[in-house]
């Protein structure tokens, strides 16, 4: 879907500032990457954000390029149901403590800018243990990595023709990621990992180029492993139908410790079952 060429859209419809921000991140992460030498048009073509049309033989944005780098008012011309919504609900007495919507007109409203704005909001309350490498403090943790994966996964696997859009909710004790569209691998395979079948393959490529997202299908299992290591309640994957939606719920509640007496009773029950 996201490989389609938008033959009637000029390349100038993409947001220049978003493109430059993305390129700067790419250069910083991979200074020797050969794409760094390309001009903007060649670069967009190389990452899949633009392609030569078979109709007029000119360069036009792809669907992925429009979603990643376009302005919201241009994106909705091609994806009428497109909507990105971040809701922060940390105080129960206030409806929203923070909100970011793609349709506000206060920013570009594209996927690239949404990702970085929302990620910064998600991690601002995460406690970072003091750790240094070669004298430099490391502010990244497995929890940061898991949240990057969860947010990218939500965007990469969304059906942008589906209704109700993408919703990310940050609450006091959990974060919920919702995207339109069913899980193409099924929720059990998502947990198991090993199979990657993203709905938007070019979007995945563009995130991978800046070191975001796991292409090998191990991203969701890594999230589960991180939550296990933290002692938090296991993440929940929900599938809803009519309309199709996929939810990933990450709770920060600690697992309830099993009492010693309960463990002994469980062992007795298992032993008795085997004897009978």
Identify the residue ranges that each predicted region occupies.
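Cytosolic regulatory/linker segments at or just downstream of nucleotide-handling modules
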Residues: 217-220, 237-241, 248
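Active-site helix-to-loop segments that bind/position phosphate- or nucleotide-bearing substrates
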Residues: 1-162, 170, 183-196, 219, ...
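Conserved alpha/beta core segments of nucleic-acid transaction machinery
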Residues: 243-271
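Conserved glycine-/histidine-rich ATP-lid loop and adjacent helix of the Bergerat-fold HATPase_c
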Residues: 227-232
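Structural motif
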Residues: 174-176, 245
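Conserved small/polar residues in nucleotide/adenosyl-binding loops
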Residues: 272-276
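Glycine-rich/acidic phosphate-handling loop/turn and adjacent ATP-lid/helix
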Residues: 176-209
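Short beta-strand/loop element within the Bergerat-fold HATPase_c
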Residues: 167-173
């Amino acid at each position: 879907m996201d490989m389609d060429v938008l033959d009637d859209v000029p390349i100038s419809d993409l947001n220049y500032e978003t493109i430059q921000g993305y390129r700067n991140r790419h250069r910083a992460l991979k200074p020797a990457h050969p794409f760094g030498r390309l001009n903007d048009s060649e670069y967009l073509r190389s990452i899949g954000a633009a392609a030569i049309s078979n109709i007029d033989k000119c360069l036009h944005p792809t669907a992925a390029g429009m979603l990643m780098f376009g302005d919201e008012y241009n994106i909705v011309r091609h994806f009428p149901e497109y909507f990105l919504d971040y809701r922060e609900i940390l105080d129960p007495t206030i409806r929203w403590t923070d909100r970011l919507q793609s349709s506000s007109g206060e920013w570009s409203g594209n996927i690239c800018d949404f990702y970085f704005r929302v990620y910064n909001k998600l991690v601002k309350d995460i406690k970072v243990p003091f750790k240094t490498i070669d004298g430099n403090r490391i502010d990244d943790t497995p929890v940061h990595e898991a949240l990057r994966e969860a947010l990218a996964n939500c965007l990469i696997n969304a059906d942008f023709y589906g209704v109700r859009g993408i919703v990310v909710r940050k609450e006091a004790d959990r974060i919920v990621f919702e995207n339109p569209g069913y899980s193409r691998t099924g929720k059990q395979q998502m947990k198991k990992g090993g199979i990657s079948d993203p709905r938007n393959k070019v979007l995945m490529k563009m995130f991978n180029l800046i070191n975001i997202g796991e292409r090998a299908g191990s991203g969701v299992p890594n999230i589960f492993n991180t939550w296990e290591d933290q002692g938090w309640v296991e993440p929940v994957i929900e599938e809803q139908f009519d309309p199709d939606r996929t939810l990933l719920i990450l709770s920060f509640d600690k697992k309830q410790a099993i009492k010693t007496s309960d463990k002994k009773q469980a062992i007795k029950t298992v032993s008795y079952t085997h004897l009978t």
